[in-house]
């Protein structure tokens, strides 16, 4: 039995979210992002600068449908080379 989509926040995204992970219903990535940031303007700002992995694969199309059992990693930009 799957329990929705797990979203894992890292670094500045974790600090802004106040949690290291959250669960959401299956939906397009853009909807999951909207749900995650709806009442958190700081997270909305941070997440706008993040990249996303869906089941360990980089995602560039936020309209992609994220299915139950999937894991999204929210990764802020990192300094360094």
Model feature map: region roles:
Residues 1-80:
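Ubiquitin-like/PB1-type beta-grasp interaction modules and other compact soluble beta-rich domains
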């Amino acid at each position: 039995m799957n329990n929705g989509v797990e979203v894992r926040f890292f670094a500045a995204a974790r600090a802004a979210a106040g949690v290291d992970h959250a669960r959401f219903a299956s939906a397009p990535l853009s909807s999951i992002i909207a749900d995650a940031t709806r009442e958190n303007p700081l997270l909305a700002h941070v997440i706008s600068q993040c990249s996303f992995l869906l089941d360990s694969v980089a995602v560039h199309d936020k309209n992609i449908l994220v299915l139950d059992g999937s894991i999204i990693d929210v990764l802020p930009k990192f300094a360094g080379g």
